[in-house]
C-alpha cells in the first residue's frame, strides 16, 4: 500500500498547475498550490500516508459532515423536516433553487442546508464552535485540532451570499436563531485545520458501522451510518457528485481547501489534499488520485 500511494502521487503531481486555488476566501488565496498528500486508514487501525499528509489545511465544507452527524446524534430523523437528502444539481451557494422550494434546502451539503444544520445545532449547544472542535478531536484522536481564526474572520467578512441564504430561509420560517451567530459558528467549523491523517482517522467510523475506535463511542447506529454515506455518495462533491461516482465510485466529501475524504464501507477511509481546484470547486489532483487508487485496489460501492 505504501508503495502504491507513493506511485499515485508521482503520477498525479503533473496536474499541479492546471487548477486554481480558491480565491473568493482571501485567507485561502495565499495557500501554496504545489502541496499534495494522501492518507489511508483501515478500520483495524492500519495507517499509510504519503506526501504532505501530515500538514494541516482548512477543511472547509468537509466540516458539513461533522455538523450533520452532531445533528443526527441529538435530533435524529426530526432534522429531515427542515431539509432534504436529494442532490441539488446547482452550485453549492445557489439561491435560485432555495427560493423556488420555499426555503427548504435540498441536502445538508450545499451551503443553505449546512446553515440549517448549524441552526439546529445552535439551538442545542451553548458553544457550537467549541462543541464541534471537541467532537472532531475525539474522532481523530488529535487534541491539537483548532479552528483558524484568521480564515474564519475572512469568511465572515465575505458572508453576504451565505447571509442572504440564511435570511431567505428565515423569511420562510426555516431558520430559528440569530443569523449572525449561526454564521460565526458555521465559519469556525469550516476553518478547522486538519491533516489528511486526521481526517482519515476522524471519518473511519463511517467505514465501521458508526463505531469510532479512538473514542470508543458508537457515533451513529448502523442505519444512520448508511444514510450519511448515501448522502455523501449523491451530494458530497457539489454539482460534480455524479462525475465523482463515475470516476471513483465511493461516498465522498470535498472542501474548497482542496481536501477530499472518501469512505470504503467496511474497510478503509482515504483522504487526499491538493489545494488547486477544478471548475466545480473540487481538488483537481485529488480526484485523479482517488480515481487511480480506486481502480488499482478495486474499491467501489458500484
Curated annotation (Swiss-Prot):
Q: Which GO terms describe its molecular function?
A: glutaminase activity
What top-level branch of life does the organism fall under?
Bacteria
Q: What EC number is given for this enzyme? A: 3.5.1.2
| One GO-annotated biological process of the protein | glutamate biosynthetic process
Q: What class of enzyme is it?
A: hydrolase
For the ligand (substrate), the binding residues are 61, 111, 155, 162, 186, 238, 256
What InterPro entries is this protein classified in?
A: Beta-lactam/transpept-like, Glutaminase
Question: Which ranges does the record mark as transmembrane?
Answer: none
- One family name in Pfam for this protein: Glutaminase
Q: Return the similarity comment.
A: Belongs to the glutaminase family.
Quaternary structure, per UniProt, is: Homotetramer.
Q: What is this protein called?
A: Glutaminase
What gene is this protein a product of? glsA
Amino acid at each position: 500500500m505504501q508503495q502504491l500511494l507513493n506511485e499515485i502521487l508521482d503520477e498525479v503531481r503533473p496536474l499541479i498547475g492546471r487548477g486554481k486555488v480558491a480565491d473568493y476566501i482571501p485567507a485561502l488565496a495565499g495557500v501554496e498550490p504545489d502541496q499534495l498528500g494522501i492518507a489511508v486508514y483501515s478500520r483495524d487501525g492500519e495507517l499509510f500516508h504519503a506526501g504532505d499528509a501530515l500538514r494541516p489545511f482548512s477543511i472547509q465544507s468537509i466540516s458539513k459532515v461533522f455538523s450533520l452527524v452532531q445533528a443526527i446524534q441529538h435530533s435524529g430523523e426530526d432534522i429531515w423536516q427542515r431539509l432534504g437528502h436529494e442532490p441539488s444539481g446547482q452550485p453549492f451557494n445557489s439561491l435560485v433553487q432555495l427560493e423556488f422550494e420555499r426555503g427548504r434546502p435540498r441536502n445538508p451539503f450545499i451551503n443553505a442546508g449546512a446553515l440549517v444544520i448549524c441552526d439546529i445545532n445552535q439551538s442545542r449547544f451553548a458553544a457550537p464552535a467549541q462543541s464541534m472542535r471537541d467532537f472532531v478531536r475525539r474522532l481523530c484522536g488529535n487534541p491539537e485540532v483548532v479552528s483558524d481564526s484568521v480564515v474564519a474572520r475572512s469568511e465572515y467578512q465575505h458572508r453576504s451570499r451565505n447571509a442572504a441564504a440564511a435570511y431567505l430561509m428565515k423569511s420562510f420560517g426555516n431558520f430559528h436563531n440569530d443569523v449572525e451567530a449561526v454564521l460565526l459558528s458555521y465559519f469556525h467549523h469550516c476553518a478547522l485545520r486538519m491533516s489528511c491523517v486526521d481526517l482519515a482517522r476522524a471519518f473511519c467510523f463511517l467505514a465501521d458501522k458508526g463505531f469510532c475506535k479512538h473514542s470508543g463511542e458508537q457515533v451513529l447506529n448502523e442505519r444512520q451510518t448508511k444514510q450519511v454515506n448515501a448522502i455523501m455518495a449523491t451530494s458530497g462533491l457539489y454539482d460534480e457528485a455524479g462525475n465523482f461516482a463515475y470516476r471513483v465510485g465511493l461516498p465522498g466529501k470535498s472542501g474548497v481547501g482542496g481536501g477530499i475524504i472518501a469512505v470504503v464501507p467496511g474497510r478503509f477511509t482515504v483522504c487526499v489534499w491538493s489545494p488547486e481546484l477544478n471548475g466545480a470547486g473540487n481538488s483537481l489532483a485529488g480526484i485523479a488520485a482517488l480515481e487511480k487508487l480506486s481502480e488499482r485496489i478495486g474499491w467501489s460501492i458500484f
